[in-house]
Amino acid sequence: MKTYLITLTPQEPYFFGNEKTFLFEKEENQGQRGNSYYIRSERTPLQSTLMGMMRYILMPYKDHKHPEQNAPVIGAESFKIDAENQSFGVIKKLSPLFVVNGGEKYVATPFDCIADSERYTPFSDYKTVETNSGKKLVTDEFVAKKGIADSYMKLSDGKTVPSYEIFGKETRVGNIKVTSGKNEKGFFKKEYVFLKNNFCFAFYADLDDSAVIPAGGKTTAFLGQGKSLFSVSFEEQENNLESEVKKLLPADIHYCLSDVFADSDVLERCEFAVVETRDYRAYITNPDGRITKDPVLYKLIKAGSVFIISDKEKFDALTQKPNCQIAGFNCIVSREEE
């Protein structure tokens, strides 16, 4: 098996959508509001998007007419977040997504970071309170007006970079036809994202020795709504991502290096947590190339979220999902086992 650093560099603004990006109004209210819509992209692709991209790049037949020949190489079906034991052929495991610049790696700053810190400075002053769910920890170091840290942490020294220095926005105006008995045109604004200051996306991929990577280790991919162009490069490299993150964490913190799909009562197993969530609905590519929308909407715990736990065994039972971890989901890092 070989490990590759996969680098994704957007060549144009991109759009990664989810359930909350479409702020559509009901048809009966459209006339009162000027038929206005606002659609906002996510900053980062989901791990399932990365898995889908890797499967497409590595599949030997891209016309969807040879599913039996493709299946041994990339697996017989798309990634399913609630499945238990899928195989993706030569793709053995993906790491969580991160961003890179000039050889430096950056990950979402842990959400227990004191606001406006130039380096990752975690909360350290906690007090215990009694709740209906048992003893919990609270801190006065969180300032509600400043909110949760919205930055990325450099793994070499813990310095933080505000997200606005990494991600830019570009708003485009278009129109869409609506049906309410008349053929009217409705305006909408679509907010695309682009990477600034020479940042790009990256992740590691463990591939079987039989995997055939693109010639010269370079190719292109079209990702997101609108199929924005990304350049993709493969470089054989050891994966030290988790060990680099661990060095920066306090001893009691469990940090979500990736988005996490967990059972609903996971927060009840924590003494302290700072979390954000994002919606997830799968779009599944069928063997004939047709794309279908999963009817189930899931909630993911967002990368950067942190937990303090008292019972690791029970916590792991709710968060350790091997099939998710193959695609790079559910990577929770701590120094507990050091």
Task: Show where each model-derived region lies.
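Conserved active-site/ligand-binding neighborhood in enzyme cores
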Residues: M1-E338
